[in-house]
């Protein structure tokens, strides 16, 4: 019995051990599976955590590279050009410009009537006051513009050459400017002999422009253009009957004589015959030149002319007009605008009444309307007039249309006091110079100034129907011309209901449009 019990216990113990062994294998398998699962999950988690980290790391590495690429792609700022002494008359801080004006004492000494305000300094300040405005605003591209007053005696041509030497050699200016009066004969001293830019407010001959195309600029058309266009306009409007004989009162000054030559060619091509009398205006002897002009009246009459073209400046034409008044010849007269101030309000105020009804072909405007009344300023002209009265307190804030330059308190028959008209040429020239100097670059040269000038078009005061334009091959600013008639108006004339003084804007001689039509200069 006992043996059976022992055997039974042995069997039970064996089963227990087998069961324990089996349980241990299952646990190991489960533990291994769980461990593998946990390991896989951990690896996936690590991969999931590592992926963004790697992407962030890659992005962090790529971002500076991209920023560097972007920085490399952006254009670098232009280096600031330093101002240098880029040309004669230009330093790092200044530009020197010669303002060439007449020493009016010479005219006063011979008894030529000049208004009290019209002084030598006044003439130069019409330009230099604009320099003051530019300088107060910071200058031209940071440079101060310095005006150098240079004078000449209008009755002594040799002093004009001295003015050139003083400007170009003694002062070594960047450029020279003259609004009116300088004898064209001496312009090549600046432009050709000394390679200096010369800006002229009147008529520069084409032959001189061709000799120095990047140094000579003007407001008015060249003598050749004025003579040709003037003669063509006279012919086209039938002012001179076909087949007439035309006299040409010219000058031995080549710059003025070129207009006579051009007019002669047009007239002869149109079937007219011509005869020319040349006055010596280069001697500096005003009395002798006027005597020659006076003698020409009888000579033209003797040669049987029907019409005379007058090309002389008014300062040398007084003898001619005086003799016309004395002899009252039957032939008509036309003035060509090829000389200083011929067809300006100032010129009209100083021209002999014997020139009454003479025709002038000019690029200058006229305040008088051929329909009566007085024209108003356009916007640019109004600005010029305001600047003028601001510059010169002597005029007490008042400037009147058509009143001769420099007049102060000109009393009318009605007791009204009138003051000088503003100088339109100087205003236009200052406007153009400021643009060209600015556009010539931080370090301007005479060549860059010329290139800048030739690109300008815009307003023009009291000329060319209010507009102007230079061009690649056009060194004069005016683009249009018109025919005007000389009107004699005594200073005791009262202002009419239309605001004019017998057709003139002031009680003084003036120019009145013949038709009011402007003609483009080809």
Where do the language-model regions lie?
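Sec-dependent bacterial lipoprotein signal peptides
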Residues: 1-20
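Extracytoplasmic ligand/sensor domains, especially the bilobed periplasmic-binding protein
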Residues: 173-278, 284, 332-361, 366-368
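Extracellular/periplasmic periplasmic-binding protein-like sensory domains
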Residues: 324-427, 514-518
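Solvent-exposed, acidic/polar segments of extracytosolic/periplasmic ligand-binding ectodomains
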Residues: 75-84, 88, 356, 457-522
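Segments of small-molecule ligand-sensing domains
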Residues: 401-424, 434-496
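Bacterial lipoprotein signal-peptidase II cleavage site
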Residues: 19, 23-35, 39
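N-terminal extracellular/periplasmic Venus flytrap/periplasmic-binding protein-like
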Residues: 62, 68, 72-166
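Beta-alpha junction/loop-to-helix N-cap segments that form part of ligand/metal-binding clefts
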Residues: 121-125, 136-213, 219, 281-291, ...
């Amino acid at each position: 019995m006992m043996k059976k019990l022992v055997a039974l216990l042995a069997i039970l113990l064996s089963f227990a051990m087998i069961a324990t062994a089996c349980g241990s294998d299952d646990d190991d398998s489960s533990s291994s599976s769980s461990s593998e699962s946990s390991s896989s999950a951990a690896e996936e988690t690590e991969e999931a955590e590592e992926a963004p980290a790697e992407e962030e790391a890659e992005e962090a590495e790529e971002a500076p590279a991209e920023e560097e690429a972007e920085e490399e792609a952006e254009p670098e700022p232009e280096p600031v050009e330093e101002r240098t002494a880029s040309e004669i008359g230009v330093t790092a801080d200044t530009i020197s410009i010669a303002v060439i004006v007449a020493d009016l004492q010479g005219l006063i000494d011979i008894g030529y009537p000049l208004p009290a305000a019209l002084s030598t300094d006044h003439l130069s300040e019409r330009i230099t006051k604009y320099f003051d405005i530019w300088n107060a605003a910071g200058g031209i591209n940071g440079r101060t513009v310095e005006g150098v007053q240079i004078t000449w005696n209008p009755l002594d041509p040799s002093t004009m050459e001295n003015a050139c030497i003083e400007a170009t050699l003694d002062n070594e200016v960047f450029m020279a400017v003259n609004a009116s009066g300088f004898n064209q004969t001496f312009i090549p001293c600046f432009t050709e002999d000394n390679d200096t830019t010369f800006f002229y407010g009147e008529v520069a001959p084409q032959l001189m422009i061709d000799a120095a195309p990047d140094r000579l600029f003007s407001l008015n058309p060249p003598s050749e253009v004025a003579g040709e266009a003037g003669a063509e306009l006279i012919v086209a409007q039938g002012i001179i009957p076909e087949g007439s004989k035309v006299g040409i009162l010219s000058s031995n000054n080549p710059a003025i004589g070129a207009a006579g030559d051009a007019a002669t060619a047009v007239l002869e091509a149109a079937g007219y015959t011509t005869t020319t009398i040349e006055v010596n205006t280069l001697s500096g002897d005003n009395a002798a030149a006027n005597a020659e002009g006076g003698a020409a009246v009888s000579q033209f009459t003797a040669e049987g002319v029907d019409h005379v073209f007058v090309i002389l400046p008014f300062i040398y034409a007084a003898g001619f007009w005086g003799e016309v008044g004395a002899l009252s010849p039957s032939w008509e007269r036309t003035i060509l605008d090829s000389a200083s101030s011929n067809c300006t309000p100032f010129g009209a105020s100083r021209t002999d009444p014997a020139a009454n009804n003479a025709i002038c072909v000019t690029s200058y405007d006229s305040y008088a309307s051929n329909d009566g009344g007085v024209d108003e300023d356009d916007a640019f002209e109004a600005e010029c007039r305001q600047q003028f009265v601001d510059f010169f307190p002597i005029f007490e804030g008042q400037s009147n249309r058509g009143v001769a330059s420099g007049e102060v308190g000109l009393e009318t028959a009605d007791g009204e006091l009138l003051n000088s008209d503003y100088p339109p040429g100087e205003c236009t020239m200052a406007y153009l110079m400021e643009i060209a100097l600015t556009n010539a670059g931080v370090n301007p040269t005479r060549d860059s100034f010329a290139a800048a000038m030739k690109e300008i078009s815009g307003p023009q005061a009291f000329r060319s129907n209010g507009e102007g334009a230079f061009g690649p091959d056009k060194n004069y600013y005016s683009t249009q011309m018109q025919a005007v008639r000389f009107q004699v108006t005594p200073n005791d004339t009262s202002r009419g209901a239309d605001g004019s003084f017998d057709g003139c804007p002031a009680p003084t001689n003036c120019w009145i449009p013949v038709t009011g039509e402007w003609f483009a200069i080809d």
